[in-house]
Regions:
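Active-site proximal loops enriched in glycine and acidic residues that flank catalytic Cys/His/Asp
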Residues: 14-16, 66, 140-142
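Noncatalytic accessory or regulatory domains flanking protease catalytic cores in secreted, cell-surface
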Residues: 170-175
């Protein structure tokens, strides 16, 4: 449902069935056709369990992959759509969560942030005719400590990301 303008709640959406098209579930003794958002949560939990328990990913990386796969590159949802559906609908096939398209490169960076630390990661970034011939995006996910005294977002930690090239003086030329 609707939350603060800079939050997407829910993070993602999934099929929960409707009276027009039910989903099939396994009840204790038989198959049942049901509808409702509460039936979508186990499907997302199952995908997260696969990413964490089978592939060995951290919960942060698993959540980021789920959100990233729901958002996709071609979708540009309106703020109203994000407020109602989150970042998009998670793909049905787990392969679409863990693999990227042939024209994409996905970097997964995971680290532990300590107080007031800055980190630089070097990725091979092409420069052509003094321009960057690509589109970049980041899906960041973390589970911060929270405190009601921290203001509107309640978190004790904040993350920022900047893309660019480090020049000869060691400074970042942001894109």
């Amino acid at each position: 449902g609707l939350a603060l303008s800079f939050f997407a709640k829910p993070d993602v959406s999934y099929y929960g069935g409707s009276k027009e098209q039910y989903i099939s579930v396994c009840e204790p003794l038989q198959k049942a056709d049901v509808a409702g958002t509460s039936y979508a949560a186990p499907w997302i939990a199952r995908k997260l369990s696969y990413l964490i328990d089978i592939l060995g990913l951290s919960r942060e990386v698993a959540k980021a992959l789920i959100i990233d796969s729901a958002r996709g590159w071609k979708k540009k949802p309106t703020p109203e759509e994000v407020a109602l559906y989150g970042h998009g609908i998670v793909p049905i096939k787990i392969e679409e969560v863990i693999q990227c398209e042939d024209d994409e490169i996905r970097f997964v960076v995971s680290d532990i942030s300590e107080k007031w630390n800055s980190y630089n990661y070097n990725f091979p970034v092409p420069l052509q005719d003094d321009k960057y011939p690509y589109v970049a995006r980041a899906t960041m996910c973390y589970f911060p400590l929270c405190n009601r005294l921290q203001g509107v977002d309640y978190t004790n930690t904040e993350l920022n990301i900047h893309f660019g090239r480090i020049n000869n003086e060691g400074k970042l030329n942001e894109i």
